[in-house]
Amino acid sequence: MTLLEARDLRVEFVSRGRRARAVDGVNLVVGQGEIVALVGESGCGKTTLARTLLGLERPASGSVLYGGVPLAYSSRALRAHRREVQLVLQDPTGSLNPRHTVYEAVAEGPRIHRLPAEGERVASALSRAGLRPPERFFNRYPHELSGGQRQRVVIAGALALDPRVLVADEPVASLDASVRGEILALLLRLRDELGLSALVVTHDLGLAWNIADRVAVMYLGRIVESGPVERILTAPSHPYTQALLSVLPESPSPVVLGGEPPDPTRIPPGCRFHPRCQILASGAAAETGVDGLCVSRPLPVLSSSAAAQVACHHAEARPASTRREAEAGAGVEVERR
């Protein structure tokens, strides 16, 4: 069952006469009890997409759907939507008011939505977030907590509204390595126990491997590759995905991308990744006869299908036998690690 969906979503910003296409045609679904990782480097549009799914940005075209119903932008509709779809920010220190106790921080949402049994909600949310006994934390302030405990308070603040979807923007980026695993395990436990769905926004493919059911890789406002996590991260087809994976510690040879970082005000013709593409630069695209297409023919917008799909002229042109051999080799390599 699809809970949250982006359908041909486009978001634009205009500044000093320049139009930035931050999200430039995205189809994405998050199903019931599913964790989807949205991956990409800074500036690719993933945070703007997440904010739009929350109703914090209004799309230029396309639509956001929740439970199959398009999101309306009246105050009442947005209020109801944000109770069902809650945001978890990456910096717990910045998202918690230092003058508010843990109780006040978690109770803020139920008070805004005028929900009954405030004390019980706060205690239950803290307990589900792993802060037990919850009463022990009621009167503490953020500076009295560890980084992991502060992130659990932020998660508890979302859980206090009984949402069905969490949108977590870099949920462990500011945490020590020793605490990251605890927070990821908590998100998985909430999915298993409460049936929560989650969209996890991250630049870290290692995090996606540990937590996600599906991965969507975003570059310059579009999803360029998506599919089941095992398929995408063991046998990536898009050169951008390959470059992101190559910086993981287990990778034998990192790919250094040339060219300029993505600029949403200057989207190149053809494949939007071609100015930095290592496949095009190496001559491999010319060998398959698609180098001209890479620089001239735009690629179609990927659908919201859960099956593996890629927007790449070179990947589409490679013989099926070569693709199978590459996928089999990648799978063996991951198992060996």
Regions found by a protein language model. Name each.
Residues 1-234, 316-337:
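ABC transporter nucleotide-binding domains
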